[in-house]
């Protein structure tokens, strides 16, 4: 497990240095370090939010529960505008699927929300705040996706993130986690 995590981190550093990394993944280590969030947690949250074939999608949108994978920021902005014209209110944006309705006012523009650096940075800061508020990374992850009154959604989400952590070598199924997620 540690070897896979070390390999991932090494490859991220190498690809970041070569400027060939996925723009979302290139920001994971920087933001994780800045806000003291375990990189495996931040990466696994990203995979849970926008992971396609093991890679985070920088211009992904979730419009009222429907995933849209735009190829560019411009295309994502167009999809966002069309969704708003149709009356959509709950729209998640970017690498880490930041919800525009609840968090959009913390960005200067839609372009900032879609910027991988700002998107991942905000997600890491938000997770750190949730951890401080709720005491554990498990609760922070659960609340990242669903509000305090939605225990079933929190459980499903947390278990998906744990599964991604295990799949990428950043964690193992503990007896407690297995019991919690498979009950």
Labelled PLM ranges:
Residues 1-5:
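Positively charged n-region of N-terminal signal peptides that target proteins for export
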Residues 6-17:
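Bacterial N-terminal signal peptides
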Residues 22-183:
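Catalytic glycan-binding domains that act on GlcNAc-containing polysaccharides
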């Amino acid at each position: 497990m540690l070897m896979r995590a070390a390999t991932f981190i090494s490859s991220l550093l190498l690809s970041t240095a070569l400027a060939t990394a996925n723009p979302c993944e290139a920001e994971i280590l920087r933001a994780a370090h800045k806000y003291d969030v375990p990189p495996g947690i931040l990466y696994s949250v990203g995979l849970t939010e926008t992971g396609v074939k093991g890679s985070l999608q920088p211009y992904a949108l979730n419009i009222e529960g429907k995933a849209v994978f735009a190829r560019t920021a411009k295309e994502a902005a167009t999809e966002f505008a069309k969704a708003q014209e149709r009356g959509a209110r709950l729209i998640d944006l970017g690498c880490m699927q930041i919800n525009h309705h609840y968090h959009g006012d913390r960005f200067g523009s839609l372009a900032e929300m879609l910027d991988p650096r700002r998107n991942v940075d905000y997600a890491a800061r938000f997770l750190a705040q949730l951890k401080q508020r709720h005491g554990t990374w498990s609760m922070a992850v659960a609340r990242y996706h669903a509000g305090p009154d939605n225990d079933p959604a929190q459980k499903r989400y947390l278990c998906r993130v744990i599964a991604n952590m295990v799949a990428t070598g950043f964690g193992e199924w503990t007896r407690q986690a297995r019991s919690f997620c498979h009950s």
